[in-house]
């Protein structure tokens, strides 16, 4: 889908990526910005991928993208926003509770998230 818009890129029309699993590809194709929810949890990886793409370091960009994708794979199984808020809480950042009609994670979901974050090295 990104390729379809590249011919229209100009000073008047910039490409912005909103799909966290496509950040590297979008930036390498000339995308100008990222709108990301998971960057709240792993901001350093997003800064690293941006620097790698700007430096032409495709290997590092790929490694960063794989890290982003591992986290996305972990949190898309259930409530995305609740998982992001819970991830931040597990990292010591209080992002507040979910507002109705949404709900916070159940204990078993929180345990799966915590173990998953440890497995992908977002928690120790």
Model-predicted regions and their roles:
Residues 1-32:
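Ligand/cofactor pocket segment of small-molecule handling proteins
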Residues 21-124:
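Structured C-terminal cap/extension of enzyme domains
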């Amino acid at each position: 889908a990104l390729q379809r818009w590249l011919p229209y890129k100009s000073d008047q029309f910039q490409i912005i990526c909103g799909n966290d699993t496509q950040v590297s590809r979008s930036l390498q194709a000339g995308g100008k910005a990222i709108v990301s929810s998971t960057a709240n949890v792993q901001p350093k990886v997003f800064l690293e991928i941006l620097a790698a793409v700007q430096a032409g370091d495709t290997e590092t960009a790929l490694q960063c993208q794989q890290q982003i994708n591992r986290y996305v794979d972990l949190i898309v199984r259930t409530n995305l926003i609740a998982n992001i808020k819970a991830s931040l809480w597990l990292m010591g950042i209080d992002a507040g509770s979910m507002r109705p009609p949404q709900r916070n994670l159940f204990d078993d979901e929180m345990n799966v998230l915590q173990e998953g974050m440890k497995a992908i090295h977002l928690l120790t």
